């Protein structure tokens, strides 16, 4: 039974690498602090086979925590140095099949393409993305997408393989690209970058994208909001303050935003409904 105290506002961090070593010293305390601030749930995506078990264990050890399984584009070169790429996909398939009965398992991710890091072989990234999208289609799972400087090619493969549900995490595309993803049925994730006044394009997107297509995230320990020092780790307990900025950008109350984002997140990852209540 999932029991939570529902504050005036409640938030779901749709993307946090809560299994990262940065949290090892005070993980439980940090999550308690987040929950005290109204962050009642979080989704922890895997990045490669080496942390498939870890994200599952961390999710089960912390109330309100869920996980996704996938191979991150920034890890594909490491993976292929350790094993044949077909073996990696087979490991992911096996992990998904094992996780399907688990109510804490909610998505396939983090997957996608990265057009920023120079030494990531593009063809290898594409191969892993396509193979993982096939798994998402086969198992009817939403995808948590990494789209840094790669919105158009990711969209191409989503259309090719008929993927219509998921989240474009840390979205930073153009208005046209946002419209394309929204029309495909995807949700767009906004986080710490939104808090910088110089982030005019992201703020414009956050203001104009249909409210029902938005979710919120921290990407902790990365993408620190504006009030943190350079290099300082991000935490899920900063999510309510990020949400406050988003509410201001949208021109709506934090309560209305909270309700909308909760519903959006459950629509983006329907398996959450096995534990989280509707609002």
Give the residues covered by each predicted segment.
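Mid-domain alpha/beta scaffold segments of enzyme catalytic cores
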Residues: 2-279
């Amino acid at each position: 039974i999932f029991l939570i105290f529902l504050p005036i506002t409640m938030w779901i961090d749709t993307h946090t690498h809560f299994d990262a070593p940065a949290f090892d010293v005070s993980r439980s305390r940090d999550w308690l602090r987040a929950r005290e601030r109204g962050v009642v749930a979080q989704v922890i995506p895997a990045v490669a086979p080496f942390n498939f078990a870890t994200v599952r264990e961390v999710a089960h050890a912390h109330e309100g925590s869920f996980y996704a399984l996938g191979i991150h584009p920034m890890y594909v070169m490491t993976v292929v140095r350790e094993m044949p790429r077909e073996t990696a996909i087979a490991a992911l398939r096996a992990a998904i099949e094992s996780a399907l009965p688990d109510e804490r398992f909610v998505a396939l991710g983090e997957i996608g393409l990265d057009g920023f890091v120079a030494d990531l072989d593009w063809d290898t990234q594409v191969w892993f993305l396509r193979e993982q999208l096939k798994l998402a289609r086969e198992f009817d799972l939403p995808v948590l997408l990494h789209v840094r400087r790669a919105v158009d090619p990711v969209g191409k493969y989503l259309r090719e393989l008929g993927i219509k549900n998921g989240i474009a995490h840390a979205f930073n595309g153009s208005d046209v690209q946002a419209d394309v993803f929204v029309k495909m049925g995807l949700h767009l994730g906004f986080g710490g970058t939104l808090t910088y006044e110089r982030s005019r394009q992201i703020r414009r997107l956050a203001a104009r994208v249909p409210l029902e297509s938005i979710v919120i995230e921290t990407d902790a320990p990365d993408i620190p909001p504006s009030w943190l020092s350079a290099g300082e780790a991000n935490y899920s307990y900063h999510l309510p303050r990020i949400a406050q900025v988003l509410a201001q950008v949208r021109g709506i109350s934090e309560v209305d935003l909270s309700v909308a984002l909760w519903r959006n997140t459950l629509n983006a990852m329907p398996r959450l409904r096995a534990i989280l209540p509707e609002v």
